[in-house]
Amino acid sequence: MTTVLLDSHVAYWWSAEPQRLSMAASQAIEHADELAVAAISWFELAWLAEQERIQLAIPVLSWLQQLAEHVRTVGITPSVAATAVALPSSFPGDPADRLIYATAIEHGWRLVTKDRRLRSHRHPRPVTVW
């Protein structure tokens, strides 16, 4: 089974503005057997809505619940936490970015993200897709 992990902004775009997804991102999502988000993404999305950095037509909780029906939520495990803090100092320092990237690594999934800082990080296997 193929699972792809959606970065927070990709989860929003997929649900509300799919035209913002690249062709490769759209194909990765379309061909996946399962879509997943890291638990920290729910906080990020709620925060972005509260700060009006994303626009929702319905209350934030209703939107999050609707989105959650279509994706698997993946929590922070000890191995994800250890991988996140072990990323080099050259990796972006934002804890959410580290946790999301580490989640993809630990599960062996591709991370769909537009974030150039994450996409430019070198890893032994391809991690990101955009």
From Swiss-Prot:
Coiled-coil stretches noted in the UniProt entry, renumbered to this chain: none
Single biological process term from Gene Ontology: negative regulation of translation
GO molecular function: magnesium ion binding; RNA nuclease activity
Group of enzyme by EC: hydrolase
Domain of life: Bacteria
Cofactors demanded by this protein: Mg(2+)
Predominant place of localization: secreted
Ranges of residues in domain PINc: 4-119
Transmembrane domains' residue ranges: none
Localization annotation: Secreted
Keyword list, A-Z: Hydrolase, Magnesium, Metal-binding, Nuclease, Secreted, Toxin-antitoxin system
Binding-site list for Mg(2+): 7, 97
EC number, as in UniProt: 3.1.-.-
Cellular component aspect of the GO annotation: extracellular region
UniProt record similarity statement: Belongs to the PINc/VapC protein family.
Purpose: Toxic component of a type II toxin-antitoxin (TA) system. An RNase. Upon expression in M.smegmatis inhibits translation and colony formation. Its toxic effect on colony formation is neutralized by coexpression with cognate antitoxin VapB22; the effect on translation has not been tested but is probably neutralized also.
Name this protein carries in UniProt: Ribonuclease VapC22
Species for this entry: Mycobacterium tuberculosis (strain ATCC 25618 / H37Rv)
